[in-house]
Amino acid sequence: MVRPKKKPVLGKDGKPLSAAAAKLRLLKRLKCTTKYEKLAADSGAKLIAGIDEVGRGALFGPVVAAAVILDPNYRIKGLRDSKLLPAETREILSKRIREHCIAWSIAAVDVARIDQLNIYWASNLAMKHAVRGLSCQPDHLLIDAMKLDLDCAQTPIIHGDALSASIAAASIIAKVHRDALIREWAPIFPEYDLASNKGYSAPKHIKALREFGPSPLHRQSFAPVWMASAPQEVLEFMLEETADTAVPPEVLED
């Protein structure tokens, strides 16, 4: 049976949006609330942690995860998926989250481990390390679309960072931390334009990989990295693919 082809999502100009841009539009329409936290509390949970990771799709640098237990008696306004927030707002919220939450923890898995395990299991590992790093252990986990091998009640939520305040808080402090790491490395590896692309796939990044080869902090198991020395026609195909899947510029802004 042949499945009907999905209709493309169109932008304001009537042209089809890339997959990444279409997802970003969807996320903007979702409402971030404490609905899932309240459901967990109603089931008897006292310490509810939100967990998320950032950098999963990047070509360069670690994958970073965070776990946050928000104080249910202190509301932090403006929490939403970190991809939807300007960098300055993320910085302000990250500080506020760390100051007013019950507990928070950040963990990173480096490129060597990513290449050894694959990015799915490396992300999973980073999340587990983040949970274990909390100063008090939670009795319920809210996780962005993943389950962890931990002895704790869990609720995986698709688009959780756009729907759950706790997961959104985790996504914010994880992104602020990872972006700070990238800022430190950008002057060391200026040829890859890391200040602009944050280590993600982008046409200038792909071209730099072809011209200079990968750095020690690139993920050698990722196709755009190990294919950097591919023939020109393959590179052109990769650039076309990148144009559709690259993270929209507003997500990467400083």
From Swiss-Prot:
<dbReference type="GO" id="GO:0043137">
    <property type="term" value="P:DNA replication, removal of RNA primer"/>
</dbReference>
<feature type="binding site">
    <location>
        <position position="144"/>
    </location>
    <ligand>
        <name>a divalent metal cation</name>
    </ligand>
</feature>
<dbReference type="InterPro" id="IPR001352">
    <property type="entry name" value="RNase_HII/HIII"/>
</dbReference>
<comment type="function">
    <text>Endonuclease that specifically degrades the RNA of RNA-DNA hybrids.</text>
</comment>
<protein>
    <recommendedName>
        <fullName>Ribonuclease HII</fullName>
        <ecNumber>3.1.26.4</ecNumber>
    </recommendedName>
</protein>
<feature type="binding site">
    <location>
        <position position="52"/>
    </location>
    <ligand>
        <name>a divalent metal cation</name>
    </ligand>
</feature>
<dbReference type="InterPro" id="IPR012337">
    <property type="entry name" value="RNaseH-like_sf"/>
</dbReference>
<dbReference type="GO" id="GO:0005737">
    <property type="term" value="C:cytoplasm"/>
</dbReference>
<feature type="binding site">
    <location>
        <position position="53"/>
    </location>
    <ligand>
        <name>a divalent metal cation</name>
    </ligand>
</feature>
<dbReference type="InterPro" id="IPR036397">
    <property type="entry name" value="RNaseH_sf"/>
</dbReference>
<dbReference type="GO" id="GO:0006298">
    <property type="term" value="P:mismatch repair"/>
</dbReference>
<keyword id="KW-0540">Nuclease</keyword>
<keyword id="KW-0479">Metal-binding</keyword>
<dbReference type="GO" id="GO:0030145">
    <property type="term" value="F:manganese ion binding"/>
</dbReference>
<dbReference type="GO" id="GO:0032299">
    <property type="term" value="C:ribonuclease H2 complex"/>
</dbReference>
<dbReference type="GO" id="GO:0003723">
    <property type="term" value="F:RNA binding"/>
</dbReference>
<dbReference type="InterPro" id="IPR024567">
    <property type="entry name" value="RNase_HII/HIII_dom"/>
</dbReference>
<comment type="similarity">
    <text>Belongs to the RNase HII family.</text>
</comment>
<keyword id="KW-0255">Endonuclease</keyword>
<dbReference type="Pfam" id="PF01351">
    <property type="entry name" value="RNase_HII"/>
</dbReference>
<keyword id="KW-0464">Manganese</keyword>
<dbReference type="InterPro" id="IPR022898">
    <property type="entry name" value="RNase_HII"/>
</dbReference>
<feature type="domain" description="RNase H type-2">
    <location>
        <begin position="46"/>
        <end position="234"/>
    </location>
</feature>
<keyword id="KW-0963">Cytoplasm</keyword>
<dbReference type="GO" id="GO:0004523">
    <property type="term" value="F:RNA-DNA hybrid ribonuclease activity"/>
</dbReference>
<keyword id="KW-0378">Hydrolase</keyword>
